[in-house]
A protein has these predicted regions:
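Gly/Ala-rich beta-loop-alpha elbow adjacent to hydrolase catalytic centers
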Residues: 94, 98, 102
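Acidic catalytic loop of the alpha/beta-hydrolase fold
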Residues: 215-220
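Catalytic active-site module of serine/aspartate enzymes centered on a nucleophile-bearing elbow/loop
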Residues: 235-276
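Active-site loop/oxyanion-hole signature of alpha/beta-hydrolase fold enzymes
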Residues: 43, 52-94, 257
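Conserved HGGG/HGGXW glycine-rich cap/lid loop of the alpha/beta-hydrolase fold
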Residues: 6-67
């Protein structure tokens, strides 16, 4: 079971799958999710890319630090995993909170990035979303993780999927979020600490960037992605019709087609530049 140990001693679990000779792709999940949230992508990537999926600190098999941490530290965790695997640069794909981590990687470590894919994410904390995250943290602390899973599901899935999967949410909740409430609350606090500095730095990103969102996303609505695409130089914006916050699961085939096509285009341009 591979781990990368970072400077503060935290061990970050990761898995490498796919074609070792393929372009490296790093997958970063969001709040309450482990690397298993990328399973539909990892399966489809198996014959194309060298895929590195990690569990964020506090989630899955990674360590859960007892001290507070920041999203910048979580971006450093991504680089530590890349160092451990021996990857000099990669296509970084991040969803939701993982998308914010991906933005930080793009700003802080431009030389390690081949491209950025920002999935259902944002670059600022709107007051209504801060209040929602605080309410989730309170639910986790006061009512437990099962109650949190039921509450959060309606923000992640489209109304149709929510109705279809409602009978299963009782067991989906604890499986899709953290082992205990403390790491979850720590990640919420890390998100809430992120300030406008990141937004101001996005214009310095030089890597090719894809911003992708569902038109039914109510947690990180289309406007958040439009803002990202406006600020980041030459960013591409794709809006998937009928998709909500969990678009990589609910609309996996469409999502995969768009993301893989973007990565392949970037790789083609890289190969052409090297040959000239």
């Amino acid at each position: 079971m591979p781990f990368a140990q970072v400077s503060d001693g935290t061990r970050i679990h990761y898995e490498v799958t796919g074609r070792r000779s393929g372009a490296p792709v790093v997958l970063i999940q969001g709040l309450g999710a482990t690397k298993s949230g990328w399973n539909l992508q990892r399966i489809a990537m198996a014959t194309r890319y060298n895929t590195i999926a990690l569990d964020n600190r506090g989630a899955g098999r990674s360590d859960a630090p007892t001290k507070p941490f920041t999203l910048e530290q979580m971006a450093d965790d991504v680089i530590a995993v890349m160092d451990e695997v021996g990857i000099e640069s990669a296509h970084i794909v991040g969803a939701s909170m993982g998308g914010v981590i991906t933005q930080i990687v793009g700003v802080k470590y431009p030389e390690r990035v081949r491209s950025l894919t920002l999935v259902c994410t944002a670059c600022r904390n709107h007051p209504w979303r801060e209040d929602l995250l605080k309410s989730w943290a309170s639910t986790a602390q006061d009512e437990g993780m099962l109650a949190l899973g039921k509450n959060a599901a309606q923000w992640v899935m489209s109304p149709r999927s929510f109705r279809r999967l409602l009978p299963a949410i009782g067991w989906l909740g604890p499986l899709s979020v953290f082992r205990s409430k403390s790491p979850f609350v720590a990640q919420v606090n890390a998100i809430l600490q992120t300030d406008e500095t990141l937004t101001d730095q996005l214009a310095t990103i030089t890597a090719p960037t894809l911003v992708i969102v569902g038109n039914q996303d109510v947690l990180t609505p289309r406007g958040d992605s439009e803002e990202l695409a406006d600020i980041i130089p030459n960013a591409e914006l794709i809006v998937i019709s009928g998709a909500a916050h969990g678009l990589m699961i609910e609309h996996a085939s469409t999502f995969n087609r768009e993301v893989f096509g973007f990565i392949d285009r970037v790789e083609s341009r890289r190969s052409l530049a090297v040959s000239q």
